[in-house]
Amino acid sequence: MAKVYYEKDVTVNVLKEKKVAIIGYGSQGHAHAQNLRDNGFDVVVGLRKGKSWDKAKEDGFSVYTVAEAAKQADVVMILLPDELQPEVYEAEIAPNLQAGNSLVFAHGFNVHFDQVKPPANVDVFLVAPKGPGHLVRRTFSEGGAVPALFAVYQDATGVATEKALSYADGIGATRAGVLETTFKEETETDLFGEQAVLCGGVTALVKAGFETLVDAGYQPELAYFECLHELKLIVDLMYEGGLENMRYSVSDTAQWGDFVSGPRVVTEDTKKAMGTVLAEIQDGTFARGWIAEHKAGRPNFHATNEKENEHEIEVVGRKLREMMPFVQPRVKVGMK
């Protein structure tokens, strides 16, 4: 079982007198910066010119280029998309790191897969809230918190663990609990969850269910409701209280169908395929493929995305959602 740390375990905040540079001001960046500031930390924001720069300024932060922010900071938290981090790190952060600084991440991908190679004289750790930035900020403002993970990759100063817990405490995570892990474990489990269950697994299951009903002659609109739209109702029940809560809340007919049919859909062969997915994450196959795809301009990524967006379930869904003005996407579709 994971070791969990709480507020009582952070007796001395070793970062309170240090300057923290938050690199990036998106979902996580704005939450980290504002929570740290509210907890008395000296925070600056490092960005390239654009809308985020203006937003951080409006929120009252001193905003600098990434290089300028990194140069003056003791702690540099990189909250940029994974694929952008190596270039920004090499060009603007690495030349400005000093011995004893802390290089911090919210996901271990680039360090674990050697895309970012920190110098030996800095501490390297991650603090990863298990929720989106808006929730990290809102719960903090309400006196609560989102749990987080932390891991130490490199302890150059001898107090990297204390620094990581101090940072986690600064964003409020110790109110809920901070679980200790490693860069390897955080990275591999995160990627596996996305690919086998949360994104890849769910989308493949939803499409297969939709196609099965449509191919059998049922109306696409009903197939959409049964296989996609109602998924939120079930996921919310699981989110709130696990599988037990979901099964308690649905009808007995639905629960019995769960018991007798679920294992016939997700079979031992499915688990073997999941094992293959995990192995390709562990040995770096997935990472190498994604890095190469990004460097090539993402031709397959964009082609697949365009094709998927025209699947019948998407065409039907767009029409049905026009009937439901209460359903509004949090992020405008097509922004990527």
From Swiss-Prot:
It comes from the Bacteria. Residues 182-327 form the KARI C-terminal knotted domain. It catalyses: (2R)-2,3-dihydroxy-3-methylbutanoate + NADP(+) = (2S)-2-acetolactate + NADPH + H(+); (2R,3R)-2,3-dihydroxy-3-methylpentanoate + NADP(+) = (S)-2-ethyl-2-hydroxy-3-oxobutanoate + NADPH + H(+). GO terms for molecular function: ketol-acid reductoisomerase activity; magnesium ion binding; NADP binding. Gene3D superfamilies: 6.10.240.10, NAD(P)-binding Rossmann-like Domain (3.40.50.720). Its cofactor is Mg(2+). Its EC number is 1.1.1.86. InterPro entries: 6-PGluconate_DH-like_C_sf, KARI, KARI_C, KARI_N, KARI_prok, NAD(P)-bd_dom_sf. Binds 2 magnesium ions per subunit. NADP(+) binds at Y25, G26, S27, Q28, R48, S52, D82, E83, L84, Q85, G133. Residues 2-181 form the KARI N-terminal Rossmann domain. Pathway: Amino-acid biosynthesis; L-isoleucine biosynthesis; L-isoleucine from 2-oxobutanoate: step 2/4; Amino-acid biosynthesis; L-valine biosynthesis; L-valine from pyruvate: step 2/4. Mg(2+) 1 binds at D190, E194. SUPFAM superfamilies: 6-phosphogluconate dehydrogenase C-terminal domain-like, NAD(P)-binding Rossmann-fold domains. GO terms for biological process: isoleucine biosynthetic process; L-valine biosynthetic process. Pfam families: KARI_C, KARI_N. Disulfide bonds: none annotated. HAMAP family: IlvC. This is Ketol-acid reductoisomerase (NADP(+)) 1. It comes from Bacillus cereus (strain ATCC 10987 / NRS 248). The lineage of its organism: Bacteria, Bacillati, Bacillota, Bacilli, Bacillales.
